[in-house]
Amino acid sequence: MISIKNVNKYYGKIQVLKDVSIEIESGEIFGIIGHSGAGKSTLLRCINGLEEYQEGSVLVSDKEVKSLNEKQMRDLRKELGMIFQHFSLLERKTVFDNVALPLECFGYSKAEIKKRVLELLEVVGISEKKNDKPRNLSGGQKQRVAIARALALNPQVLLCDEATSALDPNTTKSILSLLEDINKKLGITIIVVTHQMEVIKQICGRVAIMENGEVLEVGDTEEIFLRNTKGLRKLIGEESIILPKGTNIKILFPKDISNEAIITTMARELNIDVSIIFGKLEQFKDDILGSLIINISDKSGEQVKQYLTSKGIRWEEMINE
């Protein structure tokens, strides 16, 4: 669906994207997370042609974005809906008219516009607000209007640029649930740019972590949080753990075994002493997952590894970085 390879972008002599490569699959919800200035919004704008990139390739549906002429770019943007942090609604127009705007720009008939707008307002749950002006709406309702407008032309991809940053936590959850529902019902690819960790954990199947214009890592969201990867630790400012002498093993607790008493059972069955030196549990969607780092004597190391493997428990031996 979207293939980004070795993209470099400069503002004058300042490089803001550095050899960025990401593959985004059709129908997935893909997250791009990083601090302010990481380059994530710039990358998003390279995808829809709002920003030019000097080197590398951005393919959307097998079309090279920087090679498109004006008509081809216009056609591409029909395939790419976009929502923003501050909604970008026209204050003097009603909810209905705001959603209708892209349809009017592309020459749809009044009958087609009415049918499509009413369908979309039903999808986003604000049919009763169709005659209201934006000033009479809450932040969450405004973002629902923006989502409906972004979907007006039946895009294949929805780009979300910090779409929940201006919303309170409860409203954020409701908007994310709406996006998830749209993804499931319409099969639309959604790319979520955010600095909010909870957004990524709630809806993104895969994620890219960015810093200073570079991609630190790309992977399955659950796996990255489960393994507490180096890229994730760097993002959240978590320092590396200094490991004590002996054998140190990280035990991974995916959602299907996170509630089992693995450590105490193992210590009892093997008759060994186990010290827990680090633990981290994360709320991930509706589940709890995480990891523990345990310390055992070197002589018990192989015995513990064999035990964990026999129980189908994922583990990895740790060394000081």
UniProtKB/Swiss-Prot annotation:
CDD domains recorded: ABC_MetN_methionine_transporter (cd03258)
UniProt keyword annotations, A-Z: Amino-acid transport, ATP-binding, Cell membrane, Membrane, Nucleotide-binding, Translocase, Transport
Pfam families: ABC_tran, NIL
Predominant place of localization: membrane
Top-level taxon in the UniProt lineage: Bacteria
Binding site for ATP: G34, H35, S36, G37, A38, G39, K40, S41
Record flagged with keyword Cell membrane: yes
Entry's EC annotation: 7.4.2.11
GO molecular function, one term: ATP binding
Similarity remark: Belongs to the ABC transporter superfamily. Methionine importer (TC 3.A.1.24) family.
Role noted for this protein: Part of the ABC transporter complex MetNIQ involved in methionine import. Responsible for energy coupling to the transport system.
The name this protein goes by in its record: Methionine import ATP-binding protein MetN
